């Protein structure tokens, strides 16, 4: 019986450690999403290897780090489009980490079913 409890405790502490590592990476994304972020940088932000980073994202969040980053950037872009204040779509795309406005348009349309221009016209 003691071995079962010990294994459960070990599993729980490993899961908590993994969650803490993911949280560190998510904070890094939130603070740096407007820059060019690599998988290696995400992993380094939590002192883990890129392969461990991939595994943790799949296990804990059910997605890849790059897909998470893309979704996060698109959500931030949507927020910024709501309060554009005269800024162009290209400027908003750049501020959210998209170096190519046409790539931003394609990603936005794929995620939300309309282009950033169509979205802005609808709000």
Language-model features: locations:
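Glycine-centered tight turns that cap/initiate beta-strands
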Residues: 11, 35-36
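Short amphipathic helical patch at the helix-1/turn junction of helix-turn-helix
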Residues: 33-34, 82-85
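An amphipathic alpha-helical interaction segment
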Residues: 1-13, 17-27
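Basic/polar phosphate-binding segments, predominantly the helix-turn-helix DNA-binding elements
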Residues: 28-30, 36-75, 93-118
């Amino acid at each position: 019986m003691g071995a079962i409890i010990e294994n459960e405790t070990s599993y729980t502490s490993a899961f908590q450690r993994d969650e803490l590592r993911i949280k560190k990476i998510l904070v890094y994304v939130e603070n740096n999403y407007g820059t060019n972020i690599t998988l290696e940088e995400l992993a380094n932000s939590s002192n883990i290897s890129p392969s461990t980073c991939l595994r943790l994202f799949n296990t804990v969040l059910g997605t890849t780090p790059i897909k998470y980053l893309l979704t996060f950037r698109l959500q931030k872009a949507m927020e910024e489009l709501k309060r554009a204040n005269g800024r162009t779509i290209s400027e908003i795309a750049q501020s959210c980490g998209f170096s190519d406005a046409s790539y931003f348009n394609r990603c936005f349309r794929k995620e939300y079913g309309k282009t950033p221009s169509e979205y802005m016209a609808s709000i």
